Amino acid sequence: MSDKAVLSCRNLGKSYEEGPESVVVLSGLQLELHPGERVAIVGSSGSGKSTLLNLLGGLDTPSEGSVWLAGEELSALGEKARGLLRNRALGFVYQFHHLLPEFTALENVCMPLLIGRTAIPEARKRSTALLERVGLGHRLAHKPSELSGGERQRVAIARALINQPGLVMLDEPTGNLDHHTAQGIQDLMRELSTSSRTAFLIVTHDMSLARQMDRVLRLEDGRLVEA
């Protein structure tokens, strides 16, 4: 693994037991992401893309191989240590934003900082600044139900970025957005990859989004290949 990689995996595999059979979903995967790099993973439905994201993010355990996040081998860490590492070094954005409906945009973005024991005044200050950066400074007190789809996704991205992680993973981030809003999300990722050196790993069916990334990888037959 390169010392400069924010994420790396070697010989990564995942299989499941179904009765007497072993079903191989992923096998022998190799991947490295570096600061500021934007990589898209494409593939057909059921090819294992979500399984791969869960393995790379430490939400699932591989059947074989290893994953390193921010220089730490995930399999060598206990559950609590993995959780702390994810909160510090990794942001995650889902297709369905997963914002907490009872909290405002500002409170949702504050949440990772508060989990990391940042003082409330500092958390609010940093979260306000980041929401202003993504064009939502006028929507701080609005709850998710009061925001448009694009606004909710920008709040989710701000929440993923608030701890200044080296890597953000996105699962179909523009799947429910109109073209104009989706392009705004793409432009935001491009800007942040340059200004903050944040790496982005994106799973998508949207080839127009994938083609704007630095690299496109296809997941087929359980392996990653250059698309």
Swiss-Prot record:
EC number: 7.6.2.-
SMART domains documented for this protein: AAA
InterPro entries for the chain: AAA+_ATPase, ABC_transporter-like_ATP-bd, ABC_transporter-like_CS, ABC_transpr_LolD-like, LolD_lipo_ATP-bd, MacB-like_ATP-bd, P-loop_NTPase
A GO-annotated cellular component: plasma membrane
GO MF term list: ATP binding; ATP hydrolysis activity; transmembrane transporter activity
Membrane topology: Peripheral membrane protein
Assigned keywords, A-Z: ATP-binding, Cell inner membrane, Cell membrane, Membrane, Nucleotide-binding, Translocase, Transport
PROSITE patterns, per database record: ABC_TRANSPORTER_1, ABC_TRANSPORTER_2, LOLD
Domain (ABC transporter) ranges: 7-227
Annotated GO biological process: lipoprotein localization to outer membrane; protein localization to outer membrane
Main location: membrane
Cellular localization per UniProt: Cell inner membrane
Binding residues for ATP: 43-50
Lineage: superkingdom: Bacteria
Role description: Part of the ABC transporter complex LolCDE involved in the translocation of mature outer membrane-directed lipoproteins, from the inner membrane to the periplasmic chaperone, LolA. Responsible for the formation of the LolA-lipoprotein complex in an ATP-dependent manner.
Cross-referenced PANTHER family: IMPORT ATP-BINDING PROTEIN, LIPOPROTEIN-RELEASING SYSTEM ATP-BINDING PROTEIN LOLD
Quaternary structure and partners: The complex is composed of two ATP-binding proteins (LolD) and two transmembrane proteins (LolC and LolE).
Family: Belongs to the ABC transporter superfamily. Lipoprotein translocase (TC 3.A.1.125) family.
Name this polypeptide is given: Lipoprotein-releasing system ATP-binding protein LolD
